[in-house]
A protein has these predicted regions:
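N-terminal flexible segment immediately upstream of the FAD-binding catalytic core
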Residues: 1-72, 88-117, 261-267, 308-329, ...
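FAD-binding subdomain of flavoenzyme oxidoreductases
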Residues: 112, 127-128, 132-247
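Helix N-cap motif at beta-to-alpha junctions
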Residues: 233-236, 281-288, 339-343, 374-379
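Conserved glycine-rich FAD pyrophosphate-binding loop
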Residues: 4, 84-86, 93-100, 106, ...
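General beta-strand structural signal in soluble alpha/beta enzymes
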Residues: 25-29, 60-61, 81-85, 103-105, ...
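Short amphipathic alpha-helices in soluble, non-transmembrane regions
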Residues: 16, 74, 240-246, 286-299, ...
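A conserved active-site cap/scaffold subdomain adjacent to cofactor or substrate pockets
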Residues: 223, 240-303
């Protein structure tokens, strides 16, 4: 998608440099190219549409309060604005489909306040830095994405779940307490929202407003251990995966990979490429119980790694990281985000839909989710297979579109007020 009309970019640059300084605006061609892509190329369907848009300028505010200043100028001049954290989204969330201004929040990284049970930080704060800061007070983030290099704003606006979702659900399930957002109505000020009023901004790709600052929930910090186990067959591995739901206190993350995926993961003595791998982040006091469960159910514990590094190693092999590593080994694979009982109850039927299917599973709060990876031939093949999977009871979230699909009604309810000119990340909502 390209911009049809000529945008008043020069005028916008002058205004922003006057208010934010010369260094706030970047026109360097290499920087513009980098700011116009994310990880959408993991989808062969989206990859065929790339490049899908190019930034005309990148603006990097230094604080949350500078973000609405940028949006006021963009509103007055009619220039599209696409927010960007570290660009780690998988669905084209950060691609400026209509060109215009990419708003890079990476310098807005101040941890404003740590309280008992909450932390307030600017949108560009890296989650690793945020978690380290709150751990000094004996607390931790209850959920975070599999990549801790993500920003707080990027995770809230572009992400959904991750490590901790097994216990706490997604980032829309009470994780967010308050938001300060910049809307594109010409007002030039931050808008403060709390509780359920934050939901139209969570996983909305910045289409309803750009998150400038957030207060999120904390829990007490616990001692976690990363447990790596190996299994001879799919049934025993999935039985163990599901049985970990009974462990109290609950594990934080439980992931399963079939052997073909394990063989594509970075080499590690804790991973046996000839067997299925089930990995878990468990409370340290439950380690002995988990070891007994593995022995009783016919598996083998290959390693237990204590401390933050051990747990983060398990997290770094969860969710879409399995897709990344498999595609790195064999670029001919595509993936679907899947969920439902057939993933463990009828795996042969699931595998029969596409050639060379392999499964990565995640134990979630209410069901088993995962990634189905298979040999790609065409968009039609993918869509026909999706219909077959849905007919057998598998629910699907497609990573092959950059339009928003979740909680659309809540998003649309605030659009007329928050973005009357349709300038916030245009192209990410169905017409």
């Amino acid at each position: 998608v390209t911009t049809v009309q000529r945008l008043p970019i020069a005028q916008l640059i002058d205004r922003i440099r006057t208010d934010l300084g010369e260094e706030a605006v970047t026109l360097d061609p290499i920087r513009l190219e980098r700011a116009s892509v994310d990880w959408a190329h993991m989808s062969p369907i989206l990859k065929a549409k790339l490049p899908a848009g190019r930034a005309d300028l990148v603006v990097t505010p230094r604080s949350a309060h500078e973000i609405p200043v940028v949006l006021r100028h963009a509103y007055e001049l009619g220039v599209p604005v696409t927010p960007r954290g570290t660009g780690l989204g998988n669905y084209g969330q950060a691609i400026p489909l209509h060109g215009g201004l990419v708003l890079d929040v990476s310098r807005c990284r101040r941890v404003v306040r740590i309280d008992d049970g909450t932390v307030t930080a600017e949108a560009g704060t890296r989650l690793r830095d945020l978690d380290n800061a709150v751990r000094e007070t004996g607390q931790e983030l209850p959920i975070f994405p599999s990549t801790k290099g993500s920003t707080l704003g990027g995770f809230l606006a572009g992400g959904s779940g991750g490590t901790g979702s097994l216990i706490h659900g997604t980032n829309a399930d009470g994780f967010v307490r308050t938001l300060d957002v910049a809307v594109c109505d010409g007002g030039g000020a931050l808008r403060h929202v709390e509780g359920k009023a934050t939901l139209p901004y969570v996983h909305a790709y910045g289409t309803t407003g750009i998150i400038a600052r957030a207060t999120v929930r904390l829990t007490p910090a616990y001692d976690w251990a990363g447990v790596f186990t190996a299994w001879p067959d799919y049934r025993s591995a999935t039985t163990f995966l599901r049985s970990l739901r009974l462990v109290e206190p609950s594990p934080r993350l439980v992931s399963l990979d079939e052997a073909a995926i394990v063989a594509a993961l970075p080499e590690d003595p804790a991973l046996d490429p000839s067997r299925l791998s089930v990995r878990a982040i468990v409370r340290a006091e439950t380690e002995d119980e988990v070891r007994r469960m593995v022995a009783q159910q016919g598996g083998e514990v290959l390693a237990v790694r204590h401390g933050t590094d051990g747990a983060e190693r398990v997290s770094a092999l969860s969710f879409n990281h399995s897709t990344f590593h498999l595609q790195k080994k064999d670029a001919g694979f595509f993936h679907l985000e899947v969920a439902g009982d057939p993933l463990w109850a009828a795996p042969d039927a699931v595998r029969a839909v596409y050639p060379d299917t392999v499964l990565h599973l995640e134990l979630m709060k209410t069901q088993v989710n995962g990634m189905l990876m298979a040999r790609y031939s065409s968009p039609e093949q993918v869509y026909e297979g999706m219909a077959k999977l849905e007919a057998m009871g598998v629910s699907i979230h497609s990573p092959h579109t950059w339009t928003l699909e979740r909680r659309i009604d809540g998003v649309r309810a605030v659009l007329a007020e928050n973005d009357p000119r349709g300038l916030l990340n245009p192209g990410k909502l169905e017409p």
